[in-house]
């Protein structure tokens, strides 16, 4: 779907669910997230479509508790967390039916632009592996094919969900040592 607001509205008239999986570069979030959110909410309001967003765990802050749930507070103790919290608040306050399927860092069987391949294993041929933190601490991961199936099931059941549904995707929690 085009990033232009008028184009999104006309194209969205043909759909029941808008999947907003656009992810600009982190350095562009401050500028891009607000207008992208406005464009998607405008299109959803104009057509009655539900918005489905693959969410992340940034909202919970830097010091995650051992177990996350919908009741885990959104801390906003770093810039990316605050930006995601603001984006999600815009969906909640704009009267748009929204489903956030919240998961850890993405992993997949196919090459792509994700943290696992772009950072962790980018230099594995040289015998180097990077890890997002101490290797003895758990890190959350979402296997994309499984998360996509969960998103599809949620979209099919959107009529039974609340106006703003924040749903955790269980995924995997592994240490670097594991």
Describe these PLM feature segments.
Residues 44, 91, 123-124:
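A generic structural signal for well-ordered alpha-helical segments
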Residues 20, 24, 37-85, 99:
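Conserved Rossmann-fold NAD(P)-dependent oxidoreductase catalytic core, especially the SDR/UDP-sugar
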Residues 56, 89-110:
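Conserved beta-loop-beta element that borders a ligand/cofactor-binding pocket
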């Amino acid at each position: 779907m085009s990033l232009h607001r008028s184009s999104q509205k006309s194209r969205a008239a043909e759909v029941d669910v808008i999947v907003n999986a656009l992810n600009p570069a982190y350095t562009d979030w401050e500028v891009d997230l607000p207008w992208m959110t406005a464009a998607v909410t405008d299109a959803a309001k104009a057509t009655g479509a539900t918005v489905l967003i693959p969410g992340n765990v940034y909202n919970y802050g830097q010091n995650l508790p051992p177990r996350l749930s919908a009741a885990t507070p959104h801390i906003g103790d770093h810039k990316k967390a605050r930006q995601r919290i603001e984006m999600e608040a815009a969906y909640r306050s704009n009267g748009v039916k929204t489903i956030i399927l919240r998961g850890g860092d993405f992993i997949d069987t196919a090459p792509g632009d994700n943290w696992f391949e772009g950072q962790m294993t980018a230099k594995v041929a040289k015998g180097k592996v990077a890890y997002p933190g101490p290797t003895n601490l758990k890190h959350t991961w979402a296997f994309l094919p499984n998360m996509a199936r969960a998103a599809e099931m949620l979209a099919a059941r959107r009529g039974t969900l609340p106006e703003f549904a924040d749903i955790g995707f269980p995924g995997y929690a592994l240490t670097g040592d594991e």
